[in-house]
Amino acid sequence: MSPRLPAVTARELLAILRRHGFESVRQSGSHLVLRHADGRRTTVPVHSGKTLGRGLLRQILRDTGLTADVLTS
């Protein structure tokens, strides 16, 4: 069974992704595209303080190759 994902805002997630080597590439409206030096990329919707849905958060983790553990550390 997978661990329950914590409630995370886009701002918090962006800080975590940047700590793991992701950089902003471009922004289209409220969607920020980030890319890692090894080619992994993902899109994060940035909406004023709202928490990201669990399904979206799970997909972003899958896109980036990170685990749910990085969200709690």
Question: Which stretches of residues belong to each language-model region?
Answer:
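Basic nucleic-acid-binding interfaces
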Residues: 1-73
